[in-house]
């Protein structure tokens, strides 16, 4: 019973967030401007999303072709074609199982046709490298790091931010079994 509580809370609270939520947030779109995925913003103002949200090899933000830097795994940094330093994030090497995190989970409102986000608190159940995970979330030559959280995912929430004490640790990457979600973690700078 308790395991479904979080899933139902997201479903129940989402309509309320439509009318009270953010209206000016950026979103990942296709080349025609149609919504594809959510984006996450670090405390220092840098934007991130999931790599699988790209249209081909291009990133469209609010309908405009936008440069990006591919990080390791299923995560990209938006705005420049090379990785920029970002003090508003916590990298994968510092993320641990048991941390309580906030997920700013988002999607597109069918009522307002605007991005809508709600915050849900959850716990990191485990942290994996791609090799340990043995689940296809990235290419073998592009191995990243992932956290497993107890929160259901839905279409369009990929790219939503996951935060620990106000610092971005990664973005929603994949939902499994309607109850758990993999978070693509921000890799340490090289």
Outline where the language-model segments fall.
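Bacterial N-terminal signal peptides that target proteins for export
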Residues: 1-8
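Bacterial N-terminal signal peptides
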Residues: 8-16
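Catalytic histidine site
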Residues: 21-70, 167-189
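Extracytoplasmic
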Residues: 23, 34-36, 71-75, 117-119, ...
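Extracellular/periplasmic catalytic domains that process cell-envelope and extracellular macromolecules
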Residues: 41-42, 70-71, 94-96, 141, ...
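Active-site-proximal beta-strands of protease catalytic cores
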Residues: 45-51, 97-110, 145-152, 156-180
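Active-site substrate-binding loop(s) of clan PA
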Residues: 79-128
């Amino acid at each position: 019973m308790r395991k479904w509580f979080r899933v139902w809370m997201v479903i129940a609270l989402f309509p309320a967030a439509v009318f009270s939520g953010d209206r000016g947030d950026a979103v990942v779109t296709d080349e025609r401007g149609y919504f594809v995925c959510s984006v996450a913003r670090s405390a220092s103002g840098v934007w991130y999303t999931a790599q699988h949200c790209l249209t081909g090899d291009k990133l469209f933000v609010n309908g405009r072709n936008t440069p990006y830097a591919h990080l390791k795994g299923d995560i990209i940094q938006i705005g420049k074609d090379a990785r920029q330093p970002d003090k508003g994030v916590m990298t994968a090497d510092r993320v641990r199982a048991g941390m309580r995190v906030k997920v700013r989970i988002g999607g597109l409102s069918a009522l307002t046709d605007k991005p809508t986000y709600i915050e849900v608190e959850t716990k990191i159940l485990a942290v994996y490298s791609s090799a340990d995970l043995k689940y296809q979330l990235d290419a073998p030559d592009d191995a990243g790091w992932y956290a497993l959280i107890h929160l259901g995912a839905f279409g369009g929430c990929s790219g939503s931010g996951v935060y620990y004490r106000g610092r971005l640790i990664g973005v929603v990457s994949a939902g499994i079994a309607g109850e758990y979600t993999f978070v693509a973690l921000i890799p340490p700078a090289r």
